[in-house]
Amino acid sequence: MNWKVLEHVPLLLYILAAKTLILCLAFAGVKMYQRRSLEGKLQAEKRKQSEKKAS
């Protein structure tokens, strides 16, 4: 067995953990952005409907 490879395993695990964390944060950020844009559209739709009822 190649023992030199085993010396690099902790570094590879740290890189994998960092990559996973970055991907999770990016995914959460995209979901937050989508939710905010959807809420904005719903607010605009409610405003339009309330203006129609008022006039």
Swiss-Prot record:
* Name of the featured protein: Small integral membrane protein 11
Q: Please give the PANTHER family that the UniProt record associates with this protein.
A: SMALL INTEGRAL MEMBRANE PROTEIN 11, SMALL INTEGRAL MEMBRANE PROTEIN 11A
Q: Which parts of the chain span the membrane according to its record?
A: 9-29
The UniProt entry's coiled-coil ranges are 34-54
Q: State which tissues express it.
A: Expressed in brain, heart, kidney, thymus, liver, stomach, muscle, lung, testis, ovary, skin and eye.
Q: Which InterPro entries match?
A: SMIM11
Looking up Pfam families in the UniProt record yields:
FAM165
Which key words tag this protein in UniProt?
Coiled coil, Membrane, Transmembrane, Transmembrane helix
